[in-house]
């Protein structure tokens, strides 16, 4: 076992069978329908999906939750019924009973197998219904447990509003109004080739170019092409115009302002172009980018992270998802986005490619170390020096010392289920535990690059071997490795917990970490409580056995 661990000095990645052994991804409905308060989730699947939602979520029928099942029967699967008419009937019933702001269709394995065209039906039905319909595929064939939320947020990101063009131009132009209007500054503008199409229609051209062109310097260049008598020379103190220029100007030190003339209305056009031009490159840093966080968190946890960033002088412009569908954040090229969960790679890709946002690649705010690194990365993007993070992290670790004594030196094995494994492993290594293996259903190394780097750094600082990372692990091989390594704790899915417990392997359900509040500084104890609970149980069993003089410290004999 020692040789096996010593060989792992750097991160190693392996991929085994390619099968998903995880919780069903449609379970994302359980927390998303509570997060988006004016939504309604319609899961389109079979009775199996309905049984899963009823049993796994533990919601009674009379509670009237804001989700429902559209059960597919044999006639639906054999294509004897019109899917559109049936979904239309259900959606109109939902509108009449609940009147939500948005309806989310959740596709399942069945809709994927029979190739239901949900994306094709949704726009037409949306026009008839008058309520937005978001389509997300959360089938267990293609996605792991928590990736159900990823598909929903990726679909919802495309529904986020964009900043109107005139508003965006106005926000950029307001900064330009405060800067110098000298030809030297004008020459530094970003140029976009936009020339006159008809040089004879001067009056029409000027008014058209005033509205069409965002760059005044490019506008002047176009004038030089069609009117040789008009010229601009770069000089710090003056602007030289030829005597035959058709617009009367006056020379002013460092700035030029056209005189309004009743004989020629073109002077007014120049004046507005100068005052409403685009922002210069040297002043681009004055445009304060917005920050949008994506990932579903309980409102209390979201507030905690917001306050942590506010302490650093950073304001959050919005969340994806928002509490109400109408409050979705505005996304544009001046928006920075940062994730709070490691399973949101598809959402991050959509935000970058479709919405042209800038992604902040940071470790995830899980544990004091991860939260500190997450805040530091955001501060670096905004050019702010972090204040008090070292002291805050140290104080949190001191408060966890009673639990750290129990886990320090213990070993843990992740079988893989919820895609939180790398962040949890990094935190537990910082707590003093040894991680033998990190099994994970799916790993996007680009999206989790910062988390992987922090994991490697943590292993180096704690002087422990770097664990092996196995993507889509084979459970049979994992059982063999568990039998060989004999870890103190195995974090696994619900399907494997009881069989492992029957073989004297202490387990913890990974699904509990998904539903627990584990983000931020103050919730680090929640993670340790989940980890130490089975370890404390073993201690109590050992004490019980010693009290009665039993030679067996466990109730079940090893059956390996």
Curated annotation (Swiss-Prot):
GO CC, any one term: chloroplast
Amino-acid positions noted as binding [4Fe-4S] cluster in the UniProt annotation, renumbered to this chain: 24, 49, 109
Main location as per UniProt: plastid
GO biological process entries: light-independent chlorophyll biosynthetic process; photosynthesis, dark reaction
Compartments where found: Plastid, Chloroplast
Enzymatic reactions: chlorophyllide a + oxidized 2[4Fe-4S]-[ferredoxin] + 2 ADP + 2 phosphate = protochlorophyllide a + reduced 2[4Fe-4S]-[ferredoxin] + 2 ATP + 2 H2O
Cofactor note: Binds 1 [4Fe-4S] cluster per heterodimer. The cluster is bound at the heterodimer interface by residues from both subunits.
Molecular function in Gene Ontology: 4 iron, 4 sulfur cluster binding; ATP binding; metal ion binding; oxidoreductase activity, acting on iron-sulfur proteins as donors; oxidoreductase activity, acting on the CH-CH group of donors, iron-sulfur protein as acceptor
Pfam families documented for this protein: Oxidored_nitro
UniProt biased composition (Low complexity): 173-182
Region spans: Disordered: 173-210
SUPFAM superfamilies: Helical backbone' metal receptor
Stored InterPro entries: LIPOR_BchN/ChlN (IPR050293), Nase/OxRdtase_comp1 (IPR000510), Protochl_reductN (IPR005970)
Top enzyme category: oxidoreductase
Biased composition (Polar residues): 196-206
Organism superkingdom: Eukaryota
Keywords linked to the UniProt accession: 4Fe-4S, ATP-binding, Chlorophyll biosynthesis, Chloroplast, Iron, Iron-sulfur, Metal-binding, Nucleotide-binding, Oxidoreductase, Photosynthesis, Plastid
Annotated pathway: Porphyrin-containing compound metabolism; chlorophyll biosynthesis (light-independent)
EC number(s) on file: 1.3.7.7
Subunit description: Protochlorophyllide reductase is composed of three subunits; ChlL, ChlN and ChlB. Forms a heterotetramer of two ChlB and two ChlN subunits.
Family: Belongs to the BchN/ChlN family.
Role played: Component of the dark-operative protochlorophyllide reductase (DPOR) that uses Mg-ATP and reduced ferredoxin to reduce ring D of protochlorophyllide (Pchlide) to form chlorophyllide a (Chlide). This reaction is light-independent. The NB-protein (ChlN-ChlB) is the catalytic component of the complex.
Record's protein name: Light-independent protochlorophyllide reductase subunit N
Origin species: Tetradesmus obliquus (Green alga)
Gene name of the encoded protein: chlN
């Amino acid at each position: 076992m020692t040789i096996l661990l010593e060989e792992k000095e750097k991160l190693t990645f392996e991929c085994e069978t390619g099968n998903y052994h995880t919780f069903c991804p449609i379970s994302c409905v359980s927390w998303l329908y509570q997060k988006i308060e004016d939504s309604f989730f319609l899961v389109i699947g079979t009775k199996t999906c309905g049984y899963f939602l009823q049993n796994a979520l533990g919601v009674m029928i009379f509670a009237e939750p804001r989700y429902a099942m559209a059960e597919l029967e044999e006639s639906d699967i054999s294509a004897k019924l019109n899917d559109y008419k049936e979904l239309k009937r259900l959606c109109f019933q939902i509108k009449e009973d609940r009147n939500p702001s948005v309806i989310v269709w959740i596709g399942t394995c069945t809709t994927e197998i029979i190739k239901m065209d949900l994306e094709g039906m949704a726009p037409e039905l949306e026009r008839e219904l008058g309520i937005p319909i978001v389509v997300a595929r959360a089938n267990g064939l293609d996605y792991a447990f928590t990736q159900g939320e990823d598909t929903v947020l990726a679909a919802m990101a495309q529904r986020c509003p964009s900043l109107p063009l005139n508003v965006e131009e106005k926000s950029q132009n307001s900064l330009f109004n405060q800067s110098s209007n000298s030809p030297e500054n004008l020459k530094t503008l970003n140029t976009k080739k936009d020339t006159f199409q008809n040089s004879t229609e001067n009056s029409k051209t000027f008014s058209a170019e005033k509205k069409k062109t965002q760059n005044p310097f490019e506008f002047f260049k176009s004038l030089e092409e069609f009117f040789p008598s008009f010229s601009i020379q770069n000089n710090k103190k003056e602007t030289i115009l030829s005597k035959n220029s058709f617009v009367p100007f006056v020379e002013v030190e460092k700035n030029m302002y056209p005189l309004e003339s009743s004989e020629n209305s073109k002077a007014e056009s120049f004046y507005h172009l100068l005052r409403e031009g685009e922002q210069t490159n040297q002043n681009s840093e004055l445009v304060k980018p917005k920050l949008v966080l994506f990932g579903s968190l309980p409102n209390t946890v979201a507030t905690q992270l917001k306050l942590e960033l506010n302490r650093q002088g950073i304001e959050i412009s919005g969340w994806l998802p928002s509490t109400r569908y109408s409050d979705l954040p505005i996304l544009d090229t001046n928006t920075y986005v940062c994730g709070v969960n490691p399973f949101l790679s598809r959402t991050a890709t959509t935000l970058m490619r479709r919405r042209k946002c800038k992604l902040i690649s940071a470790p995830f705010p899980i544990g004091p170390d991860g939260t500190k690194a997450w805040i530091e990365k955001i501060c670096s993007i905004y050019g702010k020096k972090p204040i008090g993070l070292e002291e805050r992290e140290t104080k949190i670790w001191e408060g966890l010392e009673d639990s750290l004594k129990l886990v320090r030196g213990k070993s843990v094995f992740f079988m893989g289920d919820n895609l939180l494994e790398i962040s949890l492993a990094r935190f537990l290594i910082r707590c003093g535990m040894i991680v033998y293996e990190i099994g994970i259903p799916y790993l996007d190394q680009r999206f989790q690059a910062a988390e992987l780097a922090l994991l490697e750094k943590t292993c180096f600082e704690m002087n422990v071997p770097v664990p092996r990372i196995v993507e889509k692990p084979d459970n049979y091989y994992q059982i063999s490795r568990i039998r060989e390594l004999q870890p103190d704790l195995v974090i696994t899915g619900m399907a494997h917990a009881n069989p492992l417990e029957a073989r004297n392997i202490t387990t913890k359900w990974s699904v509990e970490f998904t539903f627990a509040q584990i983000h931020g500084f103050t919730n680090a104890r929640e993670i340790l409580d989940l980890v130490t609970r089975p370890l404390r149980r073993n201690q109590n069993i050992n004490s019980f056995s010693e009290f009665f003089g039993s030679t067996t410290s466990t109730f079940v004999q090893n059956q390996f």
